[in-house]
């Protein structure tokens, strides 16, 4: 089963709010998920607000889940991909 780390949309019209989730690549955007990793609020007052469970994200990355482009950018901004690369190269 191909697994992706991606965003599911919540919120109202013109006021998006996203959950960062792990889901089967074949399921629809807002369909069934495997696990929720965190939230992303791009409309926050000063800067986009990101809350993510770092340990869960690293676990899924080690298990082979592929992040989408947007989630890849979010994870790199939060420093999670750097930690993943360090752990991967340390082995």
UniProtKB/Swiss-Prot annotation:
Keywords: Ribonucleoprotein, Ribosomal protein
Domain of life: Bacteria
Pfam families (alphabetical): Ribosomal_S16
Molecular function terms, GO-annotated: structural constituent of ribosome
SUPFAM superfamilies: Ribosomal protein S16
GO annotation terms (biological process): translation
Disulfide bonds: none
GO CC annotation terms, alphabetical: cytoplasm; small ribosomal subunit
Protein family membership: Belongs to the bacterial ribosomal protein bS16 family.
HAMAP family listed in its UniProt record: Ribosomal_bS16
Name this protein carries in UniProt: Small ribosomal subunit protein bS16
Source species: Staphylococcus epidermidis (strain ATCC 35984 / DSM 28319 / BCRC 17069 / CCUG 31568 / BM 3577 / RP62A)
